[in-house]
Curated annotation (Swiss-Prot):
Protein name: Enolase
Active site: E208, K341
Source organism phylogeny: Bacteria, Pseudomonadati, Pseudomonadota, Gammaproteobacteria, Moraxellales
Enzyme class: lyase
Keyword Glycosyltransferase found: no
InterPro entries referenced in this protein's UniProt entry, alphabetically: Enolase, Enolase-like_C_sf, Enolase-like_N, Enolase_C, Enolase_CS, Enolase_N
Role according to the record: Catalyzes the reversible conversion of 2-phosphoglycerate (2-PG) into phosphoenolpyruvate (PEP). It is essential for the degradation of carbohydrates via glycolysis.
Pathway where it operates: Carbohydrate degradation; glycolysis; pyruvate from D-glyceraldehyde 3-phosphate: step 4/5
Binding sites annotated in the UniProt record for Mg(2+): D245, E289, D316
Pfam families per the UniProt record, alphabetical: Enolase_C, Enolase_N
Family: Belongs to the enolase family.
Cofactor dependence: Mg(2+)
Gene name tied to this protein: eno
Catalytic activity: (2R)-2-phosphoglycerate = phosphoenolpyruvate + H2O
Length: 429
């Protein structure tokens, strides 16, 4: 009864009103697995290709009818008749048929939606929660609840304001359950709104639900968050730590890091690494993502040498969830953590390869959403099923973000999986 009898895809809308792809995998038993592909705003140049139609007469060129057709024809023909329990074989068939380095033939949005839908169908067929099915794929026996990396203040490509650093986040590390950590994060989020209002600042939110006020500097963004933490009654540096996503590739021009929001200040690689080290010394920052440009491996090496034993240095655009590129980072001792975005690589199997390669080499793993999301909450199950340790899924508003948090609450209720808090981090354990 595990045989795949039909695969269907459709064009749906994501949280930014852009088309994305949703796939159904239907089994002989009647079980249906369904999943959606997310979409990024700031993207690494080596990400797997998200196939868009380019037809300006539909959705301003962002339609995904070609990717949908690839599912309904090529992928349908490839996988119908196969056992849904053979996740690796299903994914490898799509990879081989595509035959390109970046899945440009089928589209990573097409392959990912089908890959995840197959996992949903297999879990349902076995009457298992998805997180348990994912755990079983790689023999993961210990399940943990992830520390949420909550993006409560936005800049850069995620907001229309004057702040250069893309995300200012909080991580509630000093709690004993995910539910308590989530509550603390929500309380700080609401406190931040009141802090911004008192200062006459904009409380509109960006793509990921974080506030996007016009602040004078990156440090001012940190300061208002610290005020919100204090106002809520929590202690920054013990209850709650800060995290940054610089998305530095967005302001790296001609070998210089240029902060336009701060009067076009210009930095060399080492100078910008030193600037970040100064922020870490001054503020309770435990994690920095994409501190330098994805091509600046020399700069990354320097950044790792000065901060790698103190805080988490996360590669997103740097590693693009690609095991081959991650292996280079491991070999060259660049970064100490990887952001996992499954649409950067295009299948569940390759995503798991990246996660377990990182874990085997002492790198921490952060499961992440994209700025263009849907109600699909698969990443919550992925975070628990791989004991990844951390999840990054936006702010404490917008149902496309909150759906993941709510799924984690349900999972915690089911499993009693441990919330490790500070123990997940380099520099805190």
């Amino acid at each position: 009864m595990s045989q795949i009898v039909d695969i269907r895809a459709r064009e749906i809308l994501d949280s930014r009103g852009n088309p994305t792809i949703e796939a159904d995998v239907i089994l002989e038993s009647g079980v249906v697995g369904r999943a959606c592909a997310p979409s990024g705003a700031s993207t690494g140049s080596r990400e797997a290709l998200e196939l868009r139609d380019g037809d300006k007469s539909r959705y301003l060129g962002k339609g995904v009818r070609t990717a949908v057709q690839n599912v309904n024809s090529s992928i349908h023909e490839l996988l119908v008749g196969q056992s849904v329990f053979e996740q690796k074989a299903l994914d490898e068939k799509m990879i081989a048929f595509d035959g390109t380095e970046n899945k440009s033939k089928l589209g990573a949005n097409a392959t990912l939606a089908v890959s995840l839908a197959a996992a949903h169908a297999a879990a349902a067929e076995q009457k298992l929660p998805l997180f348990q099915y994912i755990a079983n794929l790689r023999g993961q026996t210990t399940l943990t609840m992830p520390v949420p990396m909550m993006n409560i203040l936005n800049g850069g490509a995620h907001a229309d304001n004057t702040v250069d650093i893309q995300e200012f986040m909080i991580e509630p590390v000093g709690f004993t359950s995910f539910a308590e950590a989530l509550r603390a994060g929500a309380e700080v989020f609401h406190s931040l709104k009141s802090v911004l209002k008192k200062q006459g600042l904009n409380t509109a939110v960006g793509d990921e639900g974080g506030f996007a006020p016009n602040l004078r500097s990156n440090e001012e963004a940190i300061t208002v968050i610290l005020q919100a933490i204090e106002q809520t009654g929590y202690k920054a540096g013990s209850d709650i730590m800060l995290a940054l996503d610089c998305a530095s590739s967005e302001f790296y021009k001609n070998g210089q890091y240029i902060l336009e929001g701060e009067g076009n200040k210009s930095f060399t690689s080492n100078q910008f690494a030193d600037y970040l080290a100064g922020l870490v010394k001054q503020y309770p920052i435990i994690s920095i993502e994409d501190g330098l440009d994805e091509s600046d491996w020399e700069g990354w090496s320097y950044l790792t040498s000065i901060l790698g034993d103190k805080i988490q240095l996360v590669g997103d655009d740097l590693f693009v969830t690609n095991p081959k590129i991650l292996q280079r980072g491991i070999d060259e001792k660049v970064g100490n953590s990887i952001l996992i975005k499954y649409n950067q690589i295009g299948t569940l199997t390759e995503t798991l390869d990246a996660i377990y390669l990182a874990k085997a080499n002492g790198y921490t793993t952060v499961i992440s959403h994209r700025s263009g999301e849907t109600e699909d909450s698969t990443i919550a199950d992925l975070a628990v099923g791989t004991a990844a340790g951390q999840i990054k899924t936006g702010s404490l508003c917008r149902s496309d973000r909150v759906s993941k948090y709510n799924q984690l609450l349900r999972i915690e209720e089911l499993t009693k999986a441990v919330y490790r808090g500070k123990a997940e981090f380099k520099g805190l354990n």
